[in-house]
C-alpha cells in the first residue's frame, strides 16, 4: 500500500461496490431497485432511442415509455438517526415505509407504497443515504419526508432524482 500511496492507491472493500459507492451514484440493484413492481422507465433506465429490431419485452417497454413515469427513483438523506429515547438507529434498507411530514403513507395511483429499497453510508457526501421510489409530485430536491423504522419516525430529505448524490456529472469517472 505504501508503494502506491503517491498514485492514490487505497484499500477498498466490497461495501463500496455493494452499498456505499452504489448508493452515492444512484446505481440500481436487481432485486432491490430493479424488480417486477416497477418498469425500466420508472427505474430511470429509459434510453433516448429504441432499436428497430424486435426483442423480448419490446411491446411492454414501448407502452411504458408512452405512458411515462409517475414515480422516480430518488436518493434521500437521513437528517437525524436519533430515536425518541436518544438512541442512534441506522436503517438497514428493506421496505421501511416513507411517510409525509403529516405521517401519511405515500402511495402512487397503482397503490404501490413508497418504501426504502436500499440504505447505507455515503462517505463522500457525509450523509447516510436511502434509495426509494417516490411519486413525481414528491420527487423534488429538498422535499422533507419521514421514514418509519423500528416504530420510530426519522426525518429524511430528497437529495437527488434519477441521478446521484455524489458527482452527478460523472466527472470523476470520466477523468
Predicted feature residues:
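Conserved, structured C-terminal
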Residues: 1-175
Amino acid at each position: 500500500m505504501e508503494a502506491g500511496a503517491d498514485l492514490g492507491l487505497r484499500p477498498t472493500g466490497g461495501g463500496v461496490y455493494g452499498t456505499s459507492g452504489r448508493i452515492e451514484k444512484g446505481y440500481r440493484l436487481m432485486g432491490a431497485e430493479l424488480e417486477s413492481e416497477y418498469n425500466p422507465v420508472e427505474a430511470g433506465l429509459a434510453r433516448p432511442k429504441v432499436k428497430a429490431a424486435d426483442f423480448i419485452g419490446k411491446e411492454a417497454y414501448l407502452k411504458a415509455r408512452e405512458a411515462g413515469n409517475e414515480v422516480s427513483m430518488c436518493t434521500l438523506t437521513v437528517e437525524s438517526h436519533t430515536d425518541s429515547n436518544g438512541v442512534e438507529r441506522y436503517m438497514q434498507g428493506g421496505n421501511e415505509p416513507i411517510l409525509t411530514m403529516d405521517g401519511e403513507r405515500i402511495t402512487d395511483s397503482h397503490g404501490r407504497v413508497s418504501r426504502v429499497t436500499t440504505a447505507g453510508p455515503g462517505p463522500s457526501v457525509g450523509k447516510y443515504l436511502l434509495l426509494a421510489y417516490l411519486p413525481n409530485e414528491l420527487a423534488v430536491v429538498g422535499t422533507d419526508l419521514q421514514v418509519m423504522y423500528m416504530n420510530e419516525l426519522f426525518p429524511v430529505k430528497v437529495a437527488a432524482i434519477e441521478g446521484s448524490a455524489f458527482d452527478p456529472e460523472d466527472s470523476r469517472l470520466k477523468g
